[in-house]
C-alpha cells in the first residue's frame, strides 16, 4: 500500500491482517466451487445429481453452499438416495460421495474461516491503540456503511456470479426446468 496505514477501532491494519481477512472472505467460495466442480466432473459425483441441466447444477451449487456455511440443507433432487428408482438414476451409489464431500465441506467451511477471524482478533488485541487523527476514517459515518455494503456486494457478486450464470440465470432465461 502507498500512503497512510489504515486503522480500525484505533488499531493499525497491516498486511498480516489483510491477508487473514482475505483468507476468511475467499475461503468459503473456493470450497463451494471446488466441491461443486468435483461433484459435476467426477462419475461418483454425477450419480448424486438427479436432475440434469441448469437445475442439477443449481441443486449441486446450493447443496455445497449450504453445507460449507454449516446449514446442510439441499434441494430434493440432490443425492441419488432421494430418488433411488428414477429412470437414469444409479440408485443410492452416489450418496457416499455426496455425504463425504458434504461433510468435508462442512468441516473446512467451519474451522478455517473461524481460525482466520480469531487470528485477526488476536493480532488486533495485541496492538496498542493509536490516537484518532484528523485523517481517521470514522466507522460511525454513512460513508463507512456505503463502502462496507458495496465491498460485500462486489465480493459476493465476483465470487458466485459466474457459477450462477450457469445455473439459475440460464434456467430463467431458457425457461428450462429440468
Give the positions of each predicted feature.
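Internal helix-turn-beta structural module
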Residues: 74-77, 81-87, 91, 128-161
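Membrane-helix cytosolic exit motif
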Residues: 38-42, 113-126, 157-174
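P-loop potassium selectivity filter motif centered on the GYG triad
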Residues: 46-105, 163-178
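Alpha-helical transmembrane segments and their helix-start/interface "positive-inside/aromatic belt" motifs
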Residues: 13-28, 139-151
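Alpha-helical transmembrane segments
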Residues: 1-14, 119-139
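Hydrophobic alpha-helical transmembrane segments of multi-pass membrane proteins
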Residues: 101-108, 154-157
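Hydrophobic core segments of alpha-helical transmembrane domains in multi-pass membrane transport
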Residues: 25-38, 118-122, 147-160
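Hydrophobic alpha-helical segments of multi-pass membrane transport proteins
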Residues: 28-36, 55-66, 107-126
Amino acid at each position: 500500500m502507498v500512503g497512510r496505514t489504515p486503522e480500525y477501532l484505533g488499531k493499525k491494519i497491516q498486511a498480516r491482517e489483510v491477508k487473514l481477512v482475505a483468507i476468511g472472505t475467499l475461503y468459503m467460495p473456493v470450497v463451494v466451487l471446488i466441491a461443486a466442480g468435483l461433484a459435476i466432473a467426477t462419475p461418483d459425483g454425477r450419480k448424486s445429481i438427479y436432475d440434469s441441466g441448469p437445475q442439477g447444477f443449481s441443486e449441486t451449487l446450493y447443496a455445497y453452499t449450504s453445507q460449507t456455511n454449516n446449514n446442510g440443507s439441499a434441494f430434493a433432487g440432490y443425492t441419488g438416495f432421494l430418488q433411488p428408482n428414477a429412470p437414469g438414476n444409479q440408485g443410492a451409489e452416489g450418496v457416499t460421495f455426496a455425504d463425504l464431500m458434504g461433510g468435508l465441506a462442512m468441516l473446512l467451511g467451519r474451522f478455517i474461516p473461524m481460525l482466520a477471524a480469531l487470528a485477526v482478533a488476536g493480532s488486533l488485541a495485541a496492538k496498542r491503540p493509536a490516537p484518532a487523527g484528523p485523517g481517521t476514517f470514522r466507522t460511525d459515518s454513512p460513508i463507512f456503511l456505503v463502502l462496507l455494503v458495496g465491498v460485500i456486494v462486489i465480493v459476493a457478486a465476483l465470487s458466485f456470479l459466474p457459477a450462477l450464470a450457469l445455473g439459475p440465470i440460464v434456467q430463467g432465461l431458457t425457461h428450462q426446468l429440468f
